[in-house]
Each structure stands twice: as structure tokens, then as C-alpha cells.
Amino acid sequence: MKTVSVHASRSYEIRIGRGLLQGAGEQIRAVTDAKKVMLVSDDAVWPLYGGAVRRSLETAGLTVCSFVFPHGESSKCACTYLELLDALCAQQLTRKDAIAALGGGVAGDLAGFAASTYLRGIGFIQIPTTLLAMVDSSVGGKTAIDLSAGKNLAGTFYQPWLVLCDPDCLTTLPEDIFRDGCAEVIKYAVLGNAPFFDDLRAGSAHAQLEHIIETCVTMKRDIVAQDEFDRGQRQLLNLGHTFGHGIEACSGFAVSHGSAVAIGMAMMVRAAAAFGLCTEKTRDTVVDILRQYDLPVDCAFRAEDMLPTVLHDKKAAGDTINLIVPTAVGQCRIVKTPASEIMDWLRAGGAR
């Protein structure tokens, strides 16, 4: 087992190792004095892992209840959030108890938001089962639900007590969901780790899972340590997301998050090359690795349709938006951009 320690407003460990799921009960018992744990999962993940995790928690002496919701981004909404709060009340969880998210990013965001707001905060554990959640959304303390105006517009910063990453979970992932995670992995390499980028070009993600997870969470740990509340350098982690959220919204969330981030990265590096902020070689190298991992790189939507969602981006401040722009492989910068120029960036990136 590998351990990455995070020191933020709450210090905790990210543990990475095969078979961790079966020992989740003892791992959780060691970091919390909770008597009761609410497992939060979706109806795709629960049949695969819910029983094993429940048994592990019960064997460790914990009382377990569960909340299972329909899988998909559409469940990351106020309605499901309120249903979860009602379930916590019905099961009489107290401040001494805990919520454990079992699943991908939607489960983690939803459970984390509930944990941070129910009784003004109870224990929270992340047990991610997708590559995307392991390398990104389960680490760093961001929780959120979506609003009609866009993604992640209501949320909190709330660090978990513990994160358990079991690469064995990834063996059951459909290939398209695995590819989604690869988009976030490539994001880390592009924004700040050229040697890691070379590793990804040289081999497949399946062959180096532990290395990939440890590298990504360590990078995120280091960035979060400098800027826990997303006011400065942490915004670099949103590479590909500003335009990606516009793509998700325009597709009615038919385009997955990872695919949208991949297209968003490709758009941003194309625009950067068009505006002289990176070389054409950098542009082509980034687009090529996305293609190597069978990720989409072309935008099918009109700039006019994407614009409203992009302008609602969390990195907007007044009449400007901070764009995360690649300047070389392994280097990005934050470019403060007038809202009036965002349409030009979308078109330069390839929006119709």
C-alpha cells in the first residue's frame, strides 16, 4: 500500500493499494470514532461493491445504512441532495457519525456536500471506484451539486477524513468510463509534469495504474496545500474544464465529463497556439496524446451556444474569466481574460 498525506484545513491520508476495499471497515475505524456510517452510492456501483463494503464495515463493528441513487450526472442535483439529507435524518445520524461515498465523482460530490452541511458537518470518507474519482474528484475537498445554470455552482470546501483508492475496482470499469479518467490524468501531465507526460506517451494507462494514481494525487496534494480554497494556483487544475463544462451543458450531459475535458483541453491549446501563447508543436503534441488515448478532440457545438455556460464559470470575477492556458507541455498559466473576448477564444479553439 502507498500512502499520500494531505495537510490542509484537515489532515488526512490517501491510501492506494489493491484489496483495500475488503479492508475498508478497519481502515475507517482507525480514523473515526463513528458508530454509524451511511454508504452513498449509485445503482451501477452498488451491486458491484456495496455488499463487500457493507460487510467490511459491519465486521469492524459499525452500524451501516445506505442511500443508493440513479447513476449519472442528472442525480447531482438539489432534489437528490435533499433526499439524502432526509435519509440521514431518518437514520438518525449524529455529528459523531459519518458518510462514506462509494463510487465515482457524482457520488463523491453529492455525499461530500451532504456531509459538509448536515448538522453543519459530520465525518466523510471517500472510496472512489473510477479512475477519474481516484486521481481527481476524491482529493482536495471540493464538494458540489449542479444547478440549472451550470455544473458545481452550489458547493463547499470540506476535506475528507480518509480516501481509499483500490485499483482492483478499475477492472470492472467499462472502457469508456476508464477513458474518462485518462482525460484527467493527461490534464495533470499537461499542466505541470513533463516527465509524467512522457510516461503516458510511452505506455498504456492500464499498465501503470498505481504510478498514475500516486503521481496525480501527489500533484493535486501539493497544489491544494498552496491554495486550498481555489483563489489562485489551484485554478490550474481546471485546465480543460471551462470549455468542457460548456460542452457538457450543450450536449444535455450526453457528452461525459472526461470527454468534455479532453475536448476542452484540445480547444484551449488550439486557441493558445492561435494567439501565440504556445507553439504549434505544443498544440500538436497535446492533441496527439488525447487521440492516443482514444479521447475526442473536436467540438461539435456553436460558440454562441457554449458561451452562457462558460460565462458562468467559477473562475469568473466581475467582467473577466481566468482561463487556464497551456504554454508548453508541463506548463500552464492563468490568463485573465475579458468576458467580451471569450467568444474569440471559443472560435479559435474550434467551436463552430
Regions found by a protein language model. Give the residues of each.
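Solvent-exposed alpha-helices and their adjacent loops that cap or buttress functional pockets
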Residues: 31, 92-94, 117-119, 146-147, ...
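ATP/NTP phosphate-donor binding region
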Residues: 1-98
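Short glycine/serine/threonine-rich phosphate/pyrophosphate-binding segments
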Residues: 106-113, 134, 246
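A glycine/threonine-rich phosphate-anchoring loop and its flanking beta-alpha core
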Residues: 113-202
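Generic secondary-structure signature for well-ordered alpha-helical cores
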Residues: 90, 159-163, 168-175, 183-195, ...
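C-terminal charged capping/lid subdomain of soluble metabolic enzymes
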Residues: 183-186, 277-352
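Residue-level signal for inorganic ion chemistry
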Residues: 17, 39, 77, 128, ...
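Active-site segments that bind and position negatively charged phosphate/pyrophosphate groups
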Residues: 198-305
